[in-house]
Amino acid sequence: MKKETDKLVSIAVLKARTGMREQLRRELLKLIAPTRREPGNLDYVLFELQEEPGTFYMREAFVNQAALDSHCQTDYFQAFAAKAEALLAEPLQLIFMEEVSLP
C-alpha cells in the first residue's frame, strides 16, 4: 500500500479539442520550467503521441503526495486548469504508476 511519503510517478494524458493542438502545446510547455524548479518535483517531461497529434503525455514525478498537491495549487498550474476545459476534448486523465526497476 502506498504511503503519503512515497514518491509519486504518473502520466497525465491530455487530448486537445479539434483545432486546439498548438494552443494546448504552448500552454503545457509554459508549465515545464516553473514545475521543474519546485522543490518536490523529480521529473516533468512533455511528449506528443506520434500516431495521434494533439494527444499529449506529461511524465511527472514528485517526492510525495504533498509535493503533488502543492504543484496543483501553484499560480501557473491554476492558470492552466482555468483554460483546460476550452483546450481539452476530454478531462485530463492522471495514471499513477509504481516504479518496478531502478532508474
Positions of PLM-derived features:
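Generic "edge-of-domain/loop-turn" microfeature
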Residues: 19-21, 51, 67, 101-102
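Short, structured helix-loop boundary elements
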Residues: 21, 25, 55, 74-77
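Intrinsic disorder/low-complexity signal
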Residues: 5, 26, 42, 47, ...
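Glycine-rich beta-strand-turn "strand-cap" elements at beta-sheet edges
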Residues: 1-6, 46-52, 82-103
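Short, well-ordered beta-strand segments in beta-rich or mixed alpha/beta enzyme
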Residues: 8-15, 45-72
